[in-house]
Amino acid sequence: MKGKRIWSGLLALVFCLGLLPATALAAGNFTVTKLDGETVAGSENAENYTKEYTVTEDVTVAGRTRNERLIVKEEATITLNNANMSLNECKGSPIEIAEGASATLILEGENTLSAFADGPGILVNQGATVTIQSQSDDNTDRLTVSGAKAGTYVSAEMGGGGGSITTDGYAGIGGPNFDEATNYTGAINIESGTITATGYSYGAGIGGGNFSSGGTINISGGVVTALSGGTDPDGWVGVPADTKMGAGIGGSQGCGSGDINISGGIVKAYGGYGCPGIGGAPCDVTISGNAEVTGYGGDLAAGIGGYDKDKGESNEVTISDKIGRAHV
């Protein structure tokens, strides 16, 4: 009788496993596959303690990894199929778009891109372009993306020989960190999908990294939430005046951004202390079409517009057609 119960339990377990999606069974089996089914091979990068895949054509990425990243050097379409690239064992961004390159990211299912010791979740270098789309028409495909937090990281814990790495926070989606407010971020286009982007320290949720401007940002659809570290999706959370912050969508604190154009979708953006929810200085923001927009500025800053009175230059905000909502 006991043997029958064990056998019945095993049958039930097999049956339940058969009901799980393939991605659940394959968790941890990170793959980069070409359209013809051929698997792309990565190469080791000892400096960053990581395996890197140079993407030169259309690929599908699936599975989970802690120490593998993609670099687009020309033009490619990357389908993220329930991919989880949470890099807590290496340096660099999960996905990097090189200077002058162009990448389209197509979302399928639940996807996570998380940088660890160095870099934004998606690095969009100067002159590069990234376009994010959902495979579905109802924005059920998701992307959660975050930049590296400010802090000191032990090299040996990431495969290095010793010592430590001290970094500032980075943007969720955007450019690298620099020491002056120059436009080092490329173009960021969001067309569909449900996207949550978080930046840390001076990094914007979407836009500029530490002391870097935000580049051109176009949002034409989707459900987009962008936060700078220290903010909260349920409302702005007060932090000390010396906390390092950036805009929700736009530039690093006190830095400009390229034009920000929002023509569709549902957009919520939360700026840090002294930073707008959406904007920069200088920066022109245009909201049009059927976009539903809410911008939460940190203390001393506008919901949509510029920084506090002591930082940055003037900008222009244009709202036409359906009016967005701005909260300070």
Indicate where each model-derived feature is located.
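N-terminal secretory signal peptides that target proteins for export/translocation
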Residues: 1-2
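A composition-driven surface/loop motif
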Residues: 6-9, 16, 20, 24-327
